[in-house]
Curated annotation (Swiss-Prot):
InterPro entries: GeBP-like_DBD (IPR053932). Residues 1-44 are annotated as: Disordered. It comes from Arabidopsis thaliana (Mouse-ear cress). It comes from the Eukaryota. This is Probable transcription factor At4g00232. Keywords: Transcription, Transcription regulation. Belongs to the GeBP family.
Length: 154
């Protein structure tokens, strides 16, 4: 019995006495369930490029049919896209996808502006989609001078 205690102290890195750290122990099964939940969420959030194009097309169609901006009426856009194009999308995933598509299109537009010889159609369409869906004007964004964050003391 004495050996078990010495082995434990060697494994735990202590002298065998309990030390108060002020931290609560986490349940190992709770950690595992959090990891499993993250895996499930990451599996649900996998979108193919075809799905992304369908979402963008659905947002454009929503704007042309209803006259409303899909960003302003996100619930209506979600219902429209789910009904017309993709039926297996959860609303939180749809909202996150809209945000990520905007970032992705802005990035692709910057790349396309640097190298216009790119033959991928998504690069060429990104400017059009950004303008139509989010009202993002690429030309004015490129011409707009950036403000300096440095404060000049007089």
């Amino acid at each position: 019995m004495d050996k078990a205690n010495t082995n434990r102290s060697k494994v735990c890195g202590g002298s065998g006495e309990a030390k108060l750290t002020g931290k609560k122990r986490k349940n190992v099964s709770a950690k595992q369930s959090k990891k499993d939940a993250k895996k499930e969420n990451s599996q649900m959030l996998k979108w193919s490029s075809k799905d992304e194009v369908l979402v963008l097309q659905g947002m454009l169609d929503f704007k042309s049919v209803t006259g409303k901006n899909p960003v302003d009426d996100i619930n209506g856009a979600y219902e429209f896209v789910v009904h017309e194009y993709i039926s297996t999308v959860i609303d939180e995933d749809f909202i996150e996808k809209m945000k990520s598509l905007k970032k992705k299109l802005k990035k692709k537009q910057r790349i396309y502006d640097k190298d216009p010889s790119s033959s991928e159609p998504l690069y060429q369409k990104s400017s059009e989609w950004l303008k139509m869906i989010w009202g993002y004007d690429v030309e004015s964004a490129l011409e707009k001078p950036r403000k300096s964050k440095r404060i000049i003391k007089l």
